[in-house]
Amino acid sequence: MREETKYDKEDIQMKKIVFFGGGPMGEGIMGGLIRGKVVEPQQITVSELLPARREYLEKTHGVLTTTDPAEAATADVVILAVNPNQIPNVTKVLKPHLSKETIVISIACGVALATLEEQLGADKKILRVMPNTLIQSGNGYSAACINPNVNDDDKVIITNVLNALGQTMYVTENMFETFTAFCCTGPIW
């Protein structure tokens, strides 16, 4: 079931989403956001180190690309779409550019909220999301767990972002791994 919100999508005016990592999962989320009309392609910036991948994302999706982490300074939402072993390096370059109002979404498997808070700052709005591969068609099912800094208005933004990918269930972090094992392996069968 889609999480219902007290606001319409039109009430949410996001200016910019910045992705760190433009691999397959990041691209799947990006495609869902564009397809779901959450944002226009030019409102998405992808920080990606590989020149060929940047060129591909620009041509395929019409998004902006960069290697400059300072792009996060003007983002409403930052999505960490990198492998778990890359999180420490990404958070190190990202931290100086985040405001307390920026919502940080991590899809890095196994990286706890406490770890992200330690690396980005305990005052940051952070959530973990584990999407499955069906997000590419808008039929995904994602688990999300949030830290205490995420307020009701933030949750509306988050829910509108995640609903573009399919259905979302908010769970406690201790249930996160169980959800991941159940819902993320199912689509391959």
Model-derived features with residue positions:
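Internal alpha-helical scaffold of NAD(P)-dependent oxidoreductase catalytic cores
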Residues: T115-K125, Y141-F179
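A general structural signal for well-ordered alpha-helical segments in protein cores
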Residues: G26, R54, A75, I87, ...
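Residue-level signature of catalytic and energy-coupling elements of molecular machines
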Residues: V18, I158, G186
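Helical "substrate-binding/catalytic lid" subdomain
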Residues: M175-W189
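NAD(P)+-binding Rossmann beta1-loop-alpha1 motif at the extreme N-terminus of oxidoreductases
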Residues: Y7-T60, L64-T67, N139-G140
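Rossmann-like NAD(P)(H) cofactor-binding subdomain of soluble oxidoreductases
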Residues: T60-H61, P69-A144
